Structures are given as structure tokens and as C-alpha cells.
A protein has these predicted regions:
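Short carbohydrate-recognition loop motifs
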Residues: 1-10
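Carbohydrate-active catalytic/glycan-binding domains of CAZyme proteins
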Residues: 10-16, 22, 26-27, 39, ...
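Short edge beta-strand/loop segments characteristic of extracellular beta-sandwich folds
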Residues: 30-32
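Residues on the solvent-exposed faces and adjacent turns
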Residues: 35
Length: 454
């Protein structure tokens, strides 16, 4: 059994009008189609020039697998005649540093969602572009930049296939309530709620009888925010490996530049921590990022130390690299808004509340506290790229111990082990031991119960 903890959205308190004001500050569009989609050509249902456009179209399976249709996984949802009716909404943006990025799209196959008898809602708030049906979020992308159209009274075009349409700027009037959905199925092949949802870069953690499975929530096959991913982590927990709860996001993205990189969860002195990276360089040029400043701090002092986001912003730059979130219960996390290293995929582990280790490509670092001084204690290990015998990548090292042996596995092929109760690592991959099938993010953890997976 899987329990999904979701949010239901209510738009009834929003004031809707036939025409919008300026769309730059955000908007909600409520609309309904007048008839099923049977036309092969693109049919416009609404548009505001240089701002937003909604269309419907009947696609062949070949067309459904091309372009953005591939990102939306349309080919999985044909109708009884082998065609895919789709609804697509697009916004038009001015994106800083990237003038070539002008349009952002989301869509859904109408074989899954009824846009004729039920209202659909499109929401844009500067940070999110969302589609809702039956009060549930069904698709989402993450804009950066601003809507191109700056008019206070923009022109609106309504298509002939539109049963009803209305506009609102009452973003703050949208309310949410908790909602649980039960799935009578095992965890294998699990996908999160919503359209075109995927789980990737899985991280695991075991503490106090609870197994935490933390996964990248991905839509559109890494296609969100112009291919930058705009990823965040969600969390599943279980105590018996039969019944699972998907708690939703560990934390939500708050800024348009944020895209989370893989990390690890650890427990330290009565608090849970999640170490993660920010892949800010996917949207912001390197010269505007603080990673180089952190590196220069290390070269000057021999260690890195946490720097607050306020200090980074005051320097005219953006955070990237390694960051931390903290929690009292291991479920609800709050970002600490401090950057402590330039690494974008930090793997941090705690040892008896006394010391911390961060394992990254070409280096092991240690500190006495999460926001303390991080010092490089084992330069060059674990090796990656041309320095490694099996040419493993630098992504997402995983450290674990078993029966007196310490292990590190890392991107694609990396595999090292100490002797029993020893400290020196042996390159087991170079000896021909291939323990996993080329996983880019291999993760392992000890558990104190025997799993009975379903």
C-alpha cells in the first residue's frame, strides 16, 4: 500500500473577469472546451499576444512522439482510434542571460483529463506554470524571467472551441487543503501523482527504524526550465518495506534560479539534515555564481565555511554548490539559506554525532559540524574520470559500512572497499568486481530489518 500526501487547490475565492489587467505579475485562467478535440490542425482556444496561448490538436502517434510531445509522454495515451488529443498552454518570456529562450510550454493528453465538462485552471506566478484539474496539480513547469507583454490592458483572443474562459489576478486567494490518496500496489515501478512524473537520482537513509527513500521529482525528462531540470526532492518512508508514504517535497523551490542537485540525508545531534547542491549554472552564467568565491576562500584559509545567502546576494551573485536543509522530524525540512562548498552533488555522512564526512569526486572532506570548517583530508580520492581505472564519473558517491568493511560506490563503475577494520581503500572495480549495472547515482544503506519488498 502506498499513501500519497497531496494538496487540493481551491479557486472559488478568486475574482474572475472577462479581460485581464497586466499579466506580468501573474494570472489564473479558468477555461472549458465546447466539444471534444477531433481536428488535426492546431486550434487556438485563447491567446494574449506575447504573453500566453492555449491550443488543442489531434496528434498521430508519430507526431505525439516528436518535439515537446516526447517530453510530455503523449504516445502512452492514444484514443480508441490511435490518435492523441492534446491540450497545450504556452507562455512567452524575456529570460535574462538567455535571449534564445522565449517560450515555455506544458500540455496534457485529453484522454486522461476531461476539459469539456470540468473547468481547467492555468496558473502563472513568476515561479510556476501549472495546470489543474479537479483541484489537483496535473502538470507544472518552472519559468525564469518575465512575461514579454507589459500592457496594462492586453488584447485577448478567444477561439471558437472555447465554452467559457475567465481571468483572475487573485493569486493570494487560492487556498489548499491536505488530501490523501491510497494506492493498493507495491513500490516497484512507482510514479508520483500527476501527469508525466518520474523518479530519479534516488537517495536512501535509515534511522530510528524508518527507511527514507528520497528521489528527484522530475517532469518532462529533465525538460523543465528550458532543460535545466528545476528538480526538487520528494520523500517516501516505510518501516516494513510493504507500506509506504509519499510525503511530497522535502522543501519547495523558492527562487527561479534554483534547481536541486543530488545529496544525502544524515542525522546529527537530534536534528535531521539534508545536504544537496544547486545547479544554478544551468540558468545563470558562471561569473555570477558564488562557487568561485568559496573556492578562493578555501585556497586562502585551507577550509570552506558556510556563507549566508544575504552575503552572497550583497556581493551581486547567486548561490550554487553545496547547501543544507534541517528538520526536527525527518519529514518537514527548511532550507538554511547558507552555502558551504562549491560541490553540486555533496554526499555527507555523520559518525556518532562527533564528526562529519563529505565525499565528492577527487576528495574526502571532514568537519566538526554541518556549518563548520570543512577541510580536505584525502585529496584525490575517490578518483574519477581519467584518474580512475574504470573511468567512473564524479557523481554522487555513496559511503556505507558492513561487517567491519567500509565501501564507497560512485557514478557508473566506481567501487572501493577497505580490508576488515582497515582504513586503506582497494579499487575493487579495477579487480573486475562490477556490482551494479552502470548506475550514475548508486546508493546503498544498512537497515536493521529484513525487507519484504512488494
Amino acid at each position: 500500500m502506498i499513501t500519497q500526501k497531496l494538496k487540493k487547490y481551491n479557486f472559488s475565492a478568486c475574482s474572475f473577469f472577462d479581460r485581464p489587467n497586466s499579466l506580468k505579475g501573474g494570472f489564473i485562467i479558468r477555461f472549458k472546451l465546447s466539444s471534444p478535440v477531433t481536428e488535426r490542425e492546431v486550434t487556438e482556444i485563447f491567446s494574449v499576444p506575447d504573453a500566453v496561448r492555449g491550443t488543442v490538436r489531434l496528434l498521430t502517434l508519430k507526431e505525439a512522439g516528436e518535439g515537446w510531445g516526447w517530453n510530455e509522454n503523449y504516445t502512452s495515451y492514444p484514443d480508441e482510434n490511435g490518435f492523441v488529443p492534446v491540450l497545450e498552454c504556452e507562455i512567452y518570456l524575456n529570460v535574462p542571460y538567455h535571449p534564445e529562450r522565449t517560450a515555455m510550454k506544458i500540455g496534457v493528453p485529453l484522454t486522461l483529463y476531461d476539459a469539456n465538462d470540468k473547468d481547467m485552471y492555468l496558473l502563472y506566478d513568476g515561479m510556476h506554470l501549472c495546470l489543474f484539474s479537479d483541484g489537483l496539480l496535473i502538470n507544472e513547469n518552472f519559468p525564469i524571467g518575465e512575461i514579454k507583454n507589459s500592457s496594462d490592458a492586453p488584447e485577448v483572443k478567444i477561439g471558437g472551441k472555447t465554452e467559457s474562459i475567465a481571468f483572475s489576478h487573485d493569486l493570494s486567494a487560492v487556498t489548499t487543503s491536505d488530501y490523501e490518496r491510497k494506492l493498493d500496489k507495491g513500490i516497484r515501478y512507482y510514479s508520483p501523482a500527476g501527469h508525466c512524473t518520474w523518479a530519479g537520482d534516488v537517495v536512501n537513509f535509515w534511522y530510528d527504524g524508518v527507511y527514507h527513500l528520497i528521489y528527484f521529482f522530475d517532469r518532462h525528462h529533465h525538460g523543465n526550465r528550458f532543460g535545466g531540470g528545476a528538480h526538487f526532492f520528494q520523500q517516501l518512508t516505510t518501516t516494513d518495506f510493504v507500506n509506504w508514504t509519499d510525503h511530497g517535497p522535502i522543501f519547495v523551490l523558492e527562487k527561479p534560479w534554483q534547481s536541486v542537485g543530488t545529496g544525502t540525508m544524515f542525522h546529527w545531534r537530534d536534528k535531521y539534515y539534508f545536504a544537496y547542491g544547486f545547479h544554478t549554472s544551468r540558468n545563470i552564467p558562471d561569473e555570477h555564481l558564488y562557487g568561485r568565491d568559496i573556492y578562493e576562500q578555501y585556497r586562502e584559509n585551507g577550509y570552506t565555511k558556510a556563507v549566508s545567502y544575504d552575503e552572497i546576494y550583497n556581493a551581486g551573485k547567486y548561490p550554487n554548490g553545496a547547501n543544507l536543509a534541517v528538520s526536527d522530524d525527518g519529514i518537514h525540512f527548511k532550507m538554511m539559506d547558507k552555502m558551504f562548498h562549491w560541490e553540486e552533488n555533496p554526499s555527507v555522512y555523520s559518525f556518532d554525532n562527533e564528526s562529519l564526512m563529505m565525499c565528492i569526486g577527487n576528495g574526502i572532506w571532514n568537519a566538526d559540524s554541518p556549518l563548520g570548517e570543512w577541510k580536505l583530508t584525502n585529496p584525490g580520492f575517490p578518483p574519477c574520470g581519467e584518474r580512475s581505472s574504470m573511468r567512473n564519473s564524479s557523481e554522487c558517491p555513496s559511503f556505507f559500512s558492513k561487517n567491519g568493511y567500509n565501501y564507497i560506490i560512485m557514478g557508473l563503475t566506481g567501487f572501493w572497499r577497505t580490508e576488515k577494520d582497515g582504513e586503506t581503500y582497494i579499487d575493487c572495480a579495477a579487480e573486475g568486481h562490477d556490482i551494479y549495472d552502470g548506475l550514475l547515482v548508486p546508493m546503498a544503506v544498512n537497515v536493521s530489518v529484513k525487507p519484504t519488498c512488494q
